[in-house]
């Protein structure tokens, strides 16, 4: 029991030490959201794409149907 507790404490200590001494050249999470916001391209969002209705011609390799692409037609 004592050995188990000592092992748990040692693992927790080493984990904390690893995170505390890790080299972080990007200033941590400080600018993470600002950077992600500026790199985001809203025009490339999949939510802006219109899906094809049933009966319209679709591409087999890159289907954009609302349902399934079967034999080059949306189902």
Swiss-Prot record:
Query: Which is one Gene Ontology cellular component term of this protein?
Result: extracellular region
Output the superkingdom of the source species: Eukaryota
Query: Which keywords fit this entry according to its UniProt record?
Result: Calcium channel impairing toxin, Disulfide bond, Ion channel impairing toxin, Knottin, Neurotoxin, Presynaptic neurotoxin, Secreted, Signal, Toxin, Voltage-gated calcium channel impairing toxin
**Is this entry keyworded Nucleus?**
no
Cysteine disulfide partners in this protein: 51-66, 58-69, 65-74
Give residue ranges for the propeptide: 23-49
Which tissues does the record link to its expression?
Answer: Expressed by the venom duct.
Comment, domains: The presence of a 'disulfide through disulfide knot' structurally defines this protein as a knottin. The cysteine framework is VI/VII (C-C-CC-C-C).
- The protein in question is named Omega-conotoxin-like TxMKLT1-0142
Organism source for this protein? Answer: Conus textile
């Amino acid at each position: 029991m004592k050995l188990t507790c000592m092992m748990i404490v040692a693992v927790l200590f080493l984990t904390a030490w690893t995170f505390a001494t890790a080299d972080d050249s990007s200033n941590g999470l400080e600018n993470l959201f600002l950077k992600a916001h500026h790199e985001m391209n809203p025009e490339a969002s999949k939510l802006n794409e219109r899906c094809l209705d049933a009966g319209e011609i679709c591409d087999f390799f890159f289907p954009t149907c609302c349902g399934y692409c079967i034999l080059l037609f949306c189902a």
